[in-house]
Structures are given as structure tokens and as C-alpha cells.
Amino acid sequence: MIVRRTIDKDELKELPKVVFPGRIHVIQSESETEKAVAYLLSQPILGIDSETRPSFTKGQSHKVALLQISSEECCFLFRLNMTGLTQPLVDLLENPGIIKVGLSLKDDFMMLHKRAPFNQQSCIELQDYVRQFGIQDKSLQKIYAILFKEKISKSQRLSNWEADVLSDGQKQYAATDALSLIHISEPTRRTPIS
């Protein structure tokens, strides 16, 4: 498999948009969290990402509002602004038997540590991982486009992740991001790139 190093903005604009094909579950209570984590503990690999309410005021910041964790079939959107980072989620993040893939995981975990202490295990940082195959771009959108010739829409990135109800666009965006992390890790794990 031959992989390009980079992709330009004009090329990216022309690509078809990827849409999350599975089920999306919004988790807003501790009991829902326990059920979701029970399912996720049975999966061999998970895509992990987080969203924080954007701040447009200098010096103001917010805690992580949404933790999205996806398997191949479904994505769970944990509303941390409503539940906090509960013990079942901490146990999942610390579980060494489940591979967790992400992009800029260091930043995600740094922000999540503000909600609760934990020692994440079995994590793959995709920015480092894809570099060994010659991919120089670091954004999720560009890495995905290089590998799959589809683009991930980023129109919801700066939306209010602490809203009382997430819009369909926000749910689709969050789930697509998390699943795409698994997809990025797959071809590079299976196929030697030359």
C-alpha cells in the first residue's frame, strides 16, 4: 500500500463526506454509563476522542464536556458535563486488555485528568503511528482523507458541547471522529506500507 505524505485543502474539499454508519448512544447518567462500559469492555479496540465547549474569551477555559468512545458498531457519547468522569469510565481507560486509539491523546488525557485522576493503559497515538508510514499531516481530517479518500466534516467542532441537548450534527460529528480513529489504525496494522 502506497501512502501519500500530505493532502492539500483544495483536494480535501472535493472528497465525499464520511458518515458514521452505526448506532449512536448519548449517555447522560451513571446507570447508562455502567451499561455502556460493560459493552465497551467486550471490545478489542476502541476509538477515543473528547470535545470541550469552546471559549471565545481570553483566559477562560472549560472542562471536557463530551467523551466519545466508539467500537466498530456503535459510539457512546458520554456527557461528562452531566455525569463527571465516573469510576466505570476510569476503569475502562485503565484497562490494559483493550487497545484505545486516538489523535492528540496526550491533550485529551491532560484535560480528562482535570475531571478525575487515572492511569491510561494500552493507548496508541495515531499521529506518531502514521508517521512511520510516511504520513506527515497531523490532523484527523487529513490523515483520514489520505488513507480513505473521504473527508470528515469539521463544521461542528466549535459548537456548544455543554448544550442541554446535542444536535444531530454534533452527534454525527463526534461519532464519526471516534470511529475514524479505529479505521485509521486498521490498514496500517494489517498492510505493510511500501
Specify the residue positions occupied by each region the protein language model found:
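Single conserved hydrophobic/aromatic residue that forms the stacking wall/gate
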Residues: 182-183, 187-194
